[in-house]
Amino acid sequence: MLRNRFAASSWSTTSGLLFRDAKDAFDHILLGAPDLDRGVGWIEERTGVRAQFGGNHPGRGTRNALLSLGTGHYLEIIAPDPAQPNVPDERGLGRLPSPRIIQWAVHSDDIAATKRMAEAAGIKTIGPQPGSRQRPDGKMLRWQALGIEQTTPLVPFFIQWQKGAPHPSSDAPELGSVKSLRFETPQPDELRRILRGAAVEADIRKTNLPRIVLTVQTARGEVEMS
């Protein structure tokens, strides 16, 4: 049974605030790749599941392929879009030596409220800003994204999907369910402070190099990626 991000077990209370565990709060995990086919093949080789082409991000210079991680959660394989060669590669995807997890997004039902909560906790935000993706069927999927000042590695952004729009997890091939989501960073206290300011708890560990570690229960067994 796949995990639903709204399950009651995903919530805890601390000092009167309602906290979500990152494993339930995340909307999607971004796996960066220098080439989309290479990223799709990298996942398929490890899991036996082939991602579905998601579409292009107009003006962003990227395109993606998707895999569902349960209701309200998905893995996004993102890579440069050859059809947009003049758009700067802001994430440095084309320079990646191999596919790896580069970012994560947290779901918000009210992006304005998320912004107010974060700023009340002393966290600087960017936006919200509109985003869009053109699906293969020609339909445009739209959202609002709220950025957080990157004072430490692994800080997420927050996303609110346009009302009535189908969530990308709803029609993407099923990869499996999330067993664990871990964050390794040289600055665990700073990352923890930022996440708690947005009412998110996470498994954060101190290491020399920052990375996001996702473990998925697939038909082939547990698969770890970072």
Predicted regions and their residues:
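Glyoxalase I/VOC metalloenzyme domain signal
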Residues: 19-26, 31-52, 69-226
